[in-house]
Structure formats: structure tokens, C-alpha cells
Amino acid sequence: MAALAVNKPGAGVDSGRQGSRGTAVVKVLECGVCEDVFSLQGDKVPRLLLCGHTVCHDCLTRLPLHGRAIRCPFDRQVTDLGDSGVWGLKKNFALLELLERLQNGHIGQYGAAEEAIGTSGESIIRCDEDEAHVASVYCTVCATHLCSDCSQVTHSTKTLAKHRRVPLADKPHEKTMCCQHQVHAIEFVCLEEGCQTSPLMCCVCKEYGKHQGHKHSVLEPEANQIRASILDMAHCIRTFTEEISDYSRKLVGIVQHIEGGEQIVEDGIGMAHTEHVPGTAENARSCVRAYFSDLHETLCRQEEMALSVVDAHVREKLIWLRQQQEDMTILLSQVSTACLHCEKTLQQDDCRVVLAKQEITRLLETLQKQQQQFTEVADHIQLDASIPVTFTKDNRVHIGPKMEIRVVTLGLDGAGKTTILFKLKQDEFMQPIPTIGFNVETVEYKNLKFTIWDVGGKHKLRPLWKHYYLNTQAVVFVVDSSHRDRISEAHSELAKLLTEKELRDALLLIFANKQDVAGALSVEEITELLSLHKLCCGRSWYIQGCDARSGMGLYEGLDWLSRQLVAAGVLDVA
């Protein structure tokens, strides 16, 4: 042992250095904020800040937020956080690798493990005769680890040469002795259900001890079977671990795609520089900003157009009012002149009064005509400073108390078109009379004035429908719910109607009339029989059940038209 000490000078110094290095390693593995040791996962996983410092995940979550950023607790530099917050910060993988090596017994240059590690990753066993040598064989008789040279030297005699020596890989496991009978090795395993004692037993335990009469198995095959199960389990665990790792990598990739980041690229002359790669989150925000930017521009244009309409209306109204002011001033001047002339005539003598009779008569006739004209003008003109404004769905402005809408009512003969029209107009039931030609009536509802054209539905009149399509904003198609056999005919006429170019932007309101009749088709059945979802695809349409006799459902249909045409109610601007 003295020679060994001489062969290793400065061993104490080396051990001191190793101790100081070990302390330094521990310091590196501690979080500088909470002084807890980092872990491979969980709240103590190390994460990198932009300045290069490493802080555990738990401490990062406790740091105060400054908007979407945090400050380093050591140098106060700012690190921006993405949408994932602290979870989006990169892990310190170099530190994690060092932690993993230390946990697995890898010591590197510091010598923290009890055994050295070879290049193949297997433990190196020292020779029992000379620790400077590496053992390569095992003597099963001497129970010693020997290198090849020491094996030859120590077993050079005839007696010892007979000892069985095997490679270390074939070294047999040492037999475990029974705790109850120390002289006997454990050879069997108890398989008895309900046995409360240790399953390991020797031959004495099996024959005479607590396991007497129990089911049993030989130790080695049982251990090999368990090893095989463990290997299968380990294989499953490795497969499961690979699946988890692959899923985790996908999650990391998705997070990076969402958040974006910096990417190193080379320019045309080979110089590398960082370039920001936008993530899907930033792209989505850009799409939202672009959409609302276009929307703002469109609204601004529509606002300017609406203001120009209002300005033109105000300008025309003021011009007309000022013209009326001038006319009234002239009229007032003429009336005042006539009054003065009459007063002067009254002051004159009788002869002059008689001579002025004709002139006074003409003057009075002129005044009467002017008074009559003034009365007619005053009766027809409403002196109101309000400016009623109505907005359509496409943000166009209409100025006036009522917005006029042109509506065409179509359908087969006998469906109840005229009955619906006069019920809306006069709130009266009108006996069904075939319409020859057309009827036109004005129906005021809320802030709308519907000009409704009721066109006859007889077969010979249907070719004339096209003459009423121009400038039509809404089509009311009336269906007789009580005549199931005419639904296909109504479908054919409606299909032709919807192919007309002049009606492609018109609203379509379908009245399922005569819902009060027993056995009438329901709204759902008519919708299916007319194939409305397919026929009216891409068009604004609505079907409303109604009864023209009682008026049930008629105003609900007008409500739908009002909602489709008008974006806001009438605003009285003083």
C-alpha cells in the first residue's frame, strides 16, 4: 500500500480539487433566485432568458410582468414573452444534459461516481490483485476478479490451475442465502396464493418450513420469466417514450409555428444574419388588421357618400327656403305698397276716389290672387327643420320620412295575392276575384312605403310578369298551401322566376297562404317540396306561413323585408 501511495503523488491535492470542483458543479446546478437544484422536468426545469441567465420555471412565473415582458433578476434586461408566456422560453439543454449525466452516474472529469466508465459505457472492474489493472476473468472457486497476467501468476500451481475461470460477461450471479437457514441458498419461489411470508425459500423451507406443501417453482426459471416480462415492459416503455417524445417535438414545432421566431439566413455574399420569421398567430393578426383596415376604408367611403347625399339635400333645401324667403319678401313688399296706395286714396277728395275706383279694383283682385296662391303654397309646404334619415343594409342613406320600396307580388292564380294586398292596404277581407292585368297599391309599414304590384297569375298572363321586374327590390311569391297538386307547378314558375337577371339582387318572400284550411301543407313541407334551400342558394329568402283572411303572418313577412332592407330606423336630425 505504501508503494501505491508513492505511485500516486498529490492524491490528497487531487481529491481537494475534485471536492472544490464538485461544489462548483452543485452551484451551477442551482437556481440563482431560489437556490433550489434544477430538475429535468417540472417547476424546476432551467429556462434561458434573452440576456443568457438561467432561472427555474417556478421563479420565472413569480417574476412581475411588464406588459408582455419580464426583467432578468440579475441584470434587469428585458425578455419578451410570446403568447405561451414563460412556457415559450427555451430550456437550457446543456444544463439539462449535465443533470442527466450526473443522475446516471457519468462523472466526466470530476470523478463523482464510484466506478469509472469505459468507452463502451460498461463499468470497469479493477483487478483484485492489482488495482492498476483491469479485470477480465472471474475465478469461480476463488471468487476473485483478475486480469489475464494476474490470473496466470496466481494460478500457476497445479492445484490452482484447475480452478474454473470465466470471462466477466459469463460471471455467475452470487447465490443468496436463506435468512432463516443461513447455510442453505435460496433455490425456490413460493407460488401459493394467500401466502403472507416472503416467496423466497430454500430446500429446508420448502420441505419443513413455513412453505411446506405450497406450490413452488425453481428460482432461476422464475427469475428468467420475470426478466422476460421486464424486457417486454421495457420495450413497451421505450416505444411509449418515443411516442411521447415525438408528440412533444410536434408540440414544440406547433408552438414555434404559432409564435414564430428568429432564423439565421445567408445573404447573397454569404454573410449570415438573423431574420424574423412570423408565426401563424402574427399572420392571423395581420389578416384581422387587413380585413378591418379594408372595412374601415369601405365605411369611410360610404360615410363620405352618405354625407355628400345629406349635404346635397341640405343645400337644395336651403336654396329652396331662401328662394321662398325672397318670394315672401317681394310679396310682402307688394302687399305693403298696395296698402299704402289704398291709404293715400282714402285721404283724397271724392273726385279722386271715384277716379281711382278701377285701379283699386284691379289692385284688390291682384291681392286676392296672391293671397289664394299663398294659402295653397302654405297648405302644401310643411315647414319642418327635421331631416329624416334611413340607412339601407348596404349603408346607403335615404332622406325622407318613408323609404319607398318597389315590390312585385306573383304566384299561381287563386293563391290569394290580391286578398293579401287589400288586407295589408285596408285591413279588409276581399272575396277572391281573378285578377285581369294588375293591381297596384301603396302600403306604409314602419319607416317603409311599399309600392306593391299585384300581377295576375293565370297561365296566359304569366309571360307578362317580366315587364314588372325592372327596379324591383323584393318579390313576394304566394303559394296556396291547400292545393298539394299545384305545388309542382308553383315550383316550376318559381324556378323560372329566379333565373331572371333583373331579379338576381331582389329579396324573395314566400307566403304559404291558406294555413287555416284543414289538411294544408306545413311551411316545412312546402320548403322541401319547392326545394327552396337548393333553388334559393346564394339569395336572401324567407318563407312565412299566413292566412290572408285573418291577416295572420302577413306583418311578420313585412318585418322580415324591413330587417333586410333597412339597417337603422329613421333618425330625426334637428
Swiss-Prot record:
* Molecular function via GO: GDP binding; GTP binding; GTPase activity; identical protein binding; ubiquitin protein ligase activity; ubiquitin-protein transferase activity; zinc ion binding
Which UniProt keywords are listed?
Coiled coil, Cytoplasm, Golgi apparatus, GTP-binding, Lysosome, Membrane, Metal-binding, Nucleotide-binding, Transferase, Ubl conjugation pathway, Zinc, Zinc-finger
* Group of enzyme by EC: transferase
The record lists the organism as Mus musculus (Mouse)
- Reactions this protein catalyses: S-ubiquitinyl-[E2 ubiquitin-conjugating enzyme]-L-cysteine + [acceptor protein]-L-lysine = [E2 ubiquitin-conjugating enzyme]-L-cysteine + N(6)-ubiquitinyl-[acceptor protein]-L-lysine
PROSITE patterns listed in its UniProt record:
ARF (PS51417), ZF_BBOX (PS50119), ZF_RING_1 (PS00518), ZF_RING_2 (PS50089)
The root-end lineage is:
Eukaryota, Metazoa, Chordata, Craniata, Vertebrata
Task: Name the family the entry cites.
Answer: In the C-terminal section; belongs to the small GTPase superfamily. Arf family.
Q: Which GO terms describe its biological process?
A: positive regulation of autophagy; protein ubiquitination
ZnF (RING-type) ranges: 31-76
Q: Where in the cell is it found?
A: Cytoplasm; Endomembrane system; Golgi apparatus membrane; Lysosome membrane
Q: Which gene encodes it?
A: Trim23
Q: What is known of its domains?
A: The RING-type zinc finger domain is responsible for E3 ubiquitin ligase activity.
The molecule here is called: E3 ubiquitin-protein ligase TRIM23
Q: Which residues form a coiled coil?
A: 352-379
ZnF (B box-type) ranges: 122-168
| PANTHER family recorded | ADP RIBOSYLATION FACTOR-RELATED
Q: What are its E.C. numbers?
A: 2.3.2.27
Q: How does it assemble?
A: Homodimer. Interacts with PSCD1. Interacts with UBE2D2. Interacts with TBK1 (via N-terminal kinase domain) and p62/SQSTM1.
User: Which residues lie within the region annotated ARF-like?
Assistant: 390-574
Q: Which residues bind GTP?
A: 411-418, 454-458, 513-516
This molecule's function is given as: Acts as an E3 ubiquitin-protein ligase. Plays an essential role in autophagy activation during viral infection. Mechanistically, activates TANK-binding kinase 1/TBK1 by facilitating its dimerization and ability to phosphorylate the selective autophagy receptor SQSTM1. In order to achieve this function, TRIM23 mediates 'Lys-27'-linked auto-ubiquitination of its ADP-ribosylation factor (ARF) domain to induce its GTPase activity and its recruitment to autophagosomes.
Q: Per the record, GO CC terms?
A: cytoplasm; Golgi membrane; lysosomal membrane; nucleus
